[in-house]
Amino acid sequence: MKQISATSGPTNIGLLSVGSYRPQRAVTNDELCQNIDSSDEWIYSRTGIKTRRFAARDESTASMATEAGREAIAKAGLEASDIDCVVVATSTHFLQTPACGPAVAAALGATGVPAFDISAGCAGFGYALGVAADMVRGGTAGKVLVLGSEKLSPTVDMTDRSNCFIFADGAAGVVVGETPTQGIGPTVWGSDGTQATAIRQDIDWMDYLDRPTGPRPFLRLEGSAVFRWAAFEMGKVGQQAMDAAGVRPDEIDVFLPHQANSRINEILAKSLELRPDAVIANDIEHTGNTSAASIPLAMAEVLATGAAKAGDLALLIGYGAGLSYAAQVVRLPPG
């Protein structure tokens, strides 16, 4: 019987760089409270958010991803022509087709490469990183640009005092490629569709088209349900990711959880029994919840501020709509 040939790639892979893009407009809690009965103190005490970034009308998921990707490629010392694949994690590309990935690849000058989107909510970056890592290890790509990009501000009901202050806009990403030592551990991922309504679009597009003069769709969040699930289940996922990577909690230098709520992340850090001096990313304070972009944005921030350095061992945990989750242990790239 004729054997089908297969490809294989390097065993040791890692993050070669990280790039980010934050929209210029900073929106304070006080500004949002002009439309809702709340206060800066109330919002900050429950979420850890003081300000967030909103993209301009002419900025899109694709344009923000392009800026972040351009920086990541440059920081890796590469050209766009060196990139073999572009993966964009997003839930806010406002076109049914074509996908965001090909537009980003074309804008960057990564001509002719495979490019596609992954939609896994706030866990999207972890999913995209897992796929990219397997592609490089499998030999189907040498260098993969992995991006998380979201423009959530137009999806939020600014009169909904339960969640209008949570979500924000931005993009960030990494280049994945061969490294001298292992830099990306196995992906631990999964979903629980029985809790799909906890984070959802409240009106589907077919229902909206049936009543185009009715209420428009918005993103809705059942905060208490998500809080309980994330705070008390994601610690187990983080431990599984460390076990899969052969790493102990006291060996983790940096904790990079999804930036959904600072209180959740404090609970997770405690449940994981990380070292007291381990860095816990808190980019949410000035960036808000940027869904699939939040982990790479937080990564860029801890490196840029010097809170962490290249080579540090980091635990990544993404969690959100689906409900979905993904976690990995990685070595941080140069800032």
Swiss-Prot record:
Organism, as annotated: Mycobacterium avium (strain 104)
Its job: Catalyzes the condensation reaction of fatty acid synthesis by the addition to an acyl acceptor of two carbons from malonyl-ACP. Catalyzes the first condensation reaction which initiates fatty acid synthesis and may therefore play a role in governing the total rate of fatty acid production. Possesses both acetoacetyl-ACP synthase and acetyl transacylase activities. Its substrate specificity determines the biosynthesis of branched-chain and/or straight-chain of fatty acids.
HAMAP family named in the record: FabH (MF_01815)
Start and end residues of each stretch annotated as ACP-binding: 259-263
Quaternary structure annotation from Swiss-Prot or TrEMBL: Homodimer.
Pfam families tied to this protein: ACP_syn_III, ACP_syn_III_C
EC number(s) stated in the UniProt entry for this protein: 2.3.1.301
Protein name: Mycobacterial beta-ketoacyl-[acyl-carrier-protein] synthase III
One GO molecular-function entry: beta-ketoacyl-acyl-carrier-protein synthase III activity
Name of the gene: fabH
Domain-level remarks: The last Arg residue of the ACP-binding site is essential for the weak association between ACP/AcpP and FabH.
Localization per record: Cytoplasm
Top-rank EC class of the record's enzyme: transferase
Pathway: Lipid metabolism; fatty acid biosynthesis; Lipid metabolism; mycolic acid biosynthesis
GO (cellular component) term, any one: cytoplasm
Residues annotated as catalytic: C122, H258, N289
